[in-house]
Amino acid sequence: MEELQGYLEEDRSRQQQFLYPLLFQEYIYVFAYDHGLNSSIFYEPQNSLGYDNKFSSVLVKRLIIRMYQKNYLIYSVNDIYQNIFVGHNNYFYFNFFSQILSEGFAVIVEIPFSLQLISSLEEKEIPKSHNLQSSHSIFPFLEDKLLHLNYLSDILIPYPVHMEILVQILQSWIQDVLSLHLLQFLLHEYYNWNSLIIPKKSIYVFSKENKRLFWFLYNLYIYEYEFLLVFPCKQSSFLRLISSGVLLERIHFYVKIEHLGVYRIFCQKTLWIFKDPFIHYIRYQGKSILGSRGTHFLMKKWKYHLVNFWQYYFHFWSQPYRIDIKKLSNYSFYFLGYFSSVQINSSMVRNQMLENSFLMDTLTKKFDTIIPIIPLIRSLFKAQFCTVSGYPISKPIWTDLADCDIINRFGRICRKLTHYHSGSSKKQSLYRMKYILRLSCARTLARKHKSSARSFLQRLSSGLLEEFFTEEEQVIFLIFPKIISFYLYGSYRERIWYLDIIRINDLVNCLLVTT
């Protein structure tokens, strides 16, 4: 335990201690605005507040002063009960200012971790592999490893029910007392406001309205959990997991293995436990998968170990049903928009030896991935491309655009979705999705010009079809225009994994979340 504490202190020793003064620097909020706040509350003019969409450290100073004023919350609560309109207006004031402060605070606390990531890559001379950044890079790994496993644990990683637990984890990394005190005070005030206005859990509301800060604290919690989980493995080999360094990029992966060595001080039995290649751990978007070639009893031990680990180290109870143990041969698990399973195929082989012949039953395993059609249609329905049953409809909000822009938008969405789901072994779902988007595009154009969708399909038959092809299909269509139907029916049925998918389309992300 002392050795573990030493490693934790060594990793945390690089963190900067004085971050509080950065809260009052103008460029911090410029960075926060440029990072992607155009879709948040700051993008809309705040005429009701008396300010425009520009914000500065002056607003942050006002918020901090009002927060630390004596009996500020009591006066605010009395305003709510005296005048409900004034109360909601004060809530809007506080919500607006707290988002500014939380975004600025998120930028500040990310600075030392970003510096640690850069220095770690430079010291270890680890090259950045762009292929391993793709979310598709995990599927070839699954295809290679799952064929040898027996059981799979589908784990839904729990998160603390209160933000204070996440702040305590941050406290072990950053020694700036003023910044931590301000964050705790802000969360306390935020919880009190939302308990009066919105009858929901504070962590749920906070995660929706302060995404950047929440995801930073959540990723810090994930790193702490995984660091302690794989610590024995790190001590038995020179394989250093650097996923903690990639904390801020989340889905990015770097080359982790160059040379694999073993410390000789460990006995062979201990090394076999830690270096067993048939125990694999994978995590993505709050879910993780633990696969093993061992018995069901071994997987149950892992299950209760994780439950007790969350309870005693992070001080919150995780329900055991969040960890589902299944036999891999009878189970298909949902992961990254695919239903994945290991299929067992049986084939009879006749063997002839001299005058004797006999039959041999050969079993082969195959990793299979298919697209769930219902969640895919649900995501298209939420984007208003079709009805709940999958019937294509027009998109009225795009009728003000030019015809070429409408076609380009539909085609771009279709190509991206097809590009992401190209790893499916059954393409019927992709063909149906293309049909929905193509007909929705025609109905949108027909609604704009007050015509029928059939006329647009006849007029733009070939041109409209090309816009919905992927880049590979467009090349073959230009070279061999007469064999495109054969191409779609034949070789296009093969599974293809692309290693250039860094960001996920909104529709794909909706599909991942809603399933």
Swiss-Prot record:
GO terms for molecular function: RNA binding. GO terms for biological process: mRNA processing; RNA splicing; tRNA processing. Keywords: Chloroplast, mRNA processing, Plastid, RNA-binding, tRNA processing. One of its GO terms (cellular component) is chloroplast. PANTHER family: MATURASE K. Usually encoded in the trnK tRNA gene intron. Probably assists in splicing its own and other chloroplast group II introns. Belongs to the intron maturase 2 family. MatK subfamily. This is Maturase K. The gene is matK.
